[in-house]
Amino acid sequence: LSLRSLNVPYLAAHPLELGMRLHDQAAAGADDDEAGASEPAPRLARLLAASPFDAAIHDAAGRLFERSAFQLYDEPSAAPSVDAWFPDGGAIAAVKRILRTAPVREFPATFVVGPGDDGIALVRLLSHWMVRRHYARVKLKLMGLDPEQDARRAAGIARAMDAGGAPRAWMCVDFNGAYPDADSLRTFLEEWRRDHPETYADLQYLEQPTSADSRGGEVDWRSGPPDKPVLLDEGLVGMEAFAEALERGWSGAALKTCKGLSFMLAAAAWATPRGALLTLQDLTNPGRAA
């Protein structure tokens, strides 16, 4: 039994194609007028609302054919909504090339330090999760109100790790698009490097330092790129935005299936041969299971 051999109208397209149609419709806000909304819903909210249906399409196809939905990428098929981005064999074949032959069963977990985490409580938290639970990665959320203040906070987190006996850790920083321009990020990096060079060396990448209200590519890093990779997060909303961002010096993107499994697969398949840095992020909070 194969996707092509089953002549059922509602399965006439590959799950990737159906998911990309859903993504494009949600990104464009195509249903807002029909729903009589007084103003369009935020684009990220629309993508988030649509994503469970995208996952359900893949899940339903996998159940129908009694195999992993990802095995449906083994067969050549058309995906007209996104094939134009893959002139060398189409999107289905491109996704197939980046899929692992076996799923990853274990991967490093990341401890997230929020804006309100501070003082002795933070020292205890870091000691618990990094020393006792063996977390080796830290994601630092910053408000982005003042780059010098943010740099001091980043260095303070590093000192809290030292005080709690935590080992050197892999680190990343997420600004949620708070900085107004590229110069603010450069100031942040310069101050952190000056204040705490040891942990600055552990900083791996930066997520969405500037606004995602418009296309992420509008900030141009080519004139003076930072010495750390800069990734799209909230700004990753479509293939066009991703392509423009890479042209303007962005390093890659944070992939989250909560914005659509099909789009994330297509984005990863398109970006991988171009050498973009990609991080796959799951928002699960393991709690005591960790």
Please provide the spans of the model-predicted regions.
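Hydrophobic, Leu/Ile/Phe/Ala-enriched alpha-helical segments that form helix-helix packing faces
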Residues: L1-L3, I57, A61, W129-M130, ...
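Catalytic domains of carbohydrate-active enzymes, especially glycoside hydrolases
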Residues: S68, L125-M143
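Glycine-rich, often proline-containing surface loops adjacent to acidic residues and nearby aromatics
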Residues: R105-P108, V131-K139, P167-C172
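Glycine-rich, aromatic-flanked loop segments that form ligand/cofactor-binding clefts
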Residues: L44, H58-F65, A69-I120
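Metal- or metallocofactor-binding catalytic centers and their adjacent structured scaffolds
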Residues: L1-Q71, E75-A79
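Solvent-exposed alpha-helices and their adjacent loops that cap or buttress functional pockets
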Residues: L99-V104, V131, R222-G224, L246-E247
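Catalytic core of soluble alpha/beta enzymes
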Residues: L140-T284, R288-A289
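Active-site mouth loops of central-metabolism enzymes
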Residues: R43, L47-L48, E106-R124, L142-G144, ...
